[in-house]
A protein has these predicted regions:
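Extended interaction-bearing regions that mediate binding to partners or small molecules
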Residues: 1-13
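Nudix hydrolase/Nudix homology domain
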Residues: 3, 30, 68, 79, ...
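Acidic, metal-coordinating catalytic segment for phosphate/diphosphate chemistry
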Residues: 11-45, 51
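Active-site-adjacent beta-strand/loop module that shapes the phosphate/pyrophosphate-binding cleft
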Residues: 23-28, 108-130
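Conserved Nudix-box catalytic region and its N-terminal flanking loop in Nudix hydrolases
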Residues: 40, 45-89, 127-132
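Short aromatic/basic micro-patch
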Residues: 71, 121, 144
Length: 158
């Protein structure tokens, strides 16, 4: 099966994303259009477990949904930075915890139908006190849950 990009038009370029509309030739010879959100930087997230066996989460406002959402600590991978270095940095910036160990778990493609974003996922342990360094426009609440509590929250849609 082959797909051919016949033309590509940039419709928006911002700080975080670029949006393109591409005209494609489909495998049957027909033509179709596809919108693509191109992330300028990929991201990394971390499942961090404290010494009491609880998972660390951050709750923060996410404007597209206009509500506070519970998330794992995560952030963009800066130019020249590894995914592991990014999660160690983000974990400390968001939660004030340093990880002695971070293990790569997998790479996720959360919205493959229209977005190029890739997220590297890590598992971190051996947490010690660090220094929380939030961005000026970043306000987070740190929450800790056991694995069982986190799974129950997922099942309840929380």
């Amino acid at each position: 099966m082959s797909y051919e990009v016949l033309e590509s038009r940039k419709t928006y370029e911002g700080k975080i994303v670029t949006i393109t509309v591409d005209k494609l030739r489909m495998p049957d010879g027909s033509e179709a259009y596809r919108e693509t959100v191109i992330r300028k930087k990929n991201a990394a997230g971390v499942l961090a477990v404290d010494t009491d066996g609880r998972l660390l989460f951050v709750r923060q406002y996410r404007h597209p949904f206009r509500e506070m959402l519970l998330e794992i600590p995560a952030g963009v991978i800066e130019e020249g930075e590894s995914g592991e270095a990014a999660v160690l940095r983000e974990l400390e910036e968001e939660t004030g915890k340093r990880a002695g160990r971070a293990e790569f778990l997998c790479e996720l493609y959360p919205s493959v139908g229209f977005c190029t974003e890739k997220i590297q996922l890590f598992f971190a342990t051996e947490l010690t006190a660090g220094t929380q360094k939030l961005d000026a426009d970043e306000f987070v609440e740190i929450e800790k849950y056991t694995l069982e509590e986190a799974i129950a929250m997922i099942h309840k849609g929380e």
